[in-house]
Amino acid sequence: MLRKTNLSNITTLLRSARCMNRMPQLRFEHTKGDLKRVNRSYETRDAMLARLKYQSRKRGILETDLLLSNFAKDQIDKYPVSLLREYDQLLDEPDWDILYWCSGEREAPEKWKSSQVFKELSKYCRSQRNHTLRMPELF
């Protein structure tokens, strides 16, 4: 069965869940050196594209999966390697943070406010608010 959701409903659900104290305010604190980045300097552009599309699709939170997988399908094929690396770094952020930042629920950190990839993702999120999203086809 295909799952569908509407991004404008996501924002409403997030707000109502917080108002009813069903969902805690999630805060993720990162300390330097938490995660070691995998050395992918050997990775070809095609391999990087395939990996990023997969990682965009398999996040863990359906709403973020839908947003990122559709964004990746529509946008990242045209990115140069430098922007693909930037998108790769964005995918290292927690799902809830990405969703809150893109939906405007929370202010994004300065690092991402100035990011071209994040600006395009936020614009994409706003443009999809009234659309029903579904997972893109794998092939």
From Swiss-Prot:
It comes from the Eukaryota. InterPro entries: SDH (IPR005631), SDH_sf (IPR036714), SDHAF2 (IPR028882). Keywords: Chaperone, Mitochondrion, Transit peptide. Plays an essential role in the assembly of succinate dehydrogenase (SDH), an enzyme complex (also referred to as respiratory complex II) that is a component of both the tricarboxylic acid (TCA) cycle and the mitochondrial electron transport chain, and which couples the oxidation of succinate to fumarate with the reduction of ubiquinone (coenzyme Q) to ubiquinol. Required for flavinylation (covalent attachment of FAD) of the flavoprotein subunit of the SDH catalytic dimer. It is found in: Mitochondrion; Mitochondrion matrix. Residues 1-28 form a transit peptide. GO terms for cellular component: mitochondrial matrix; mitochondrion. Transmembrane segments: none annotated. Belongs to the SDHAF2 family. Interacts with the flavoprotein subunit within the SDH catalytic dimer. It comes from Schizosaccharomyces pombe (strain 972 / ATCC 24843). This is Succinate dehydrogenase assembly factor 2, mitochondrial.
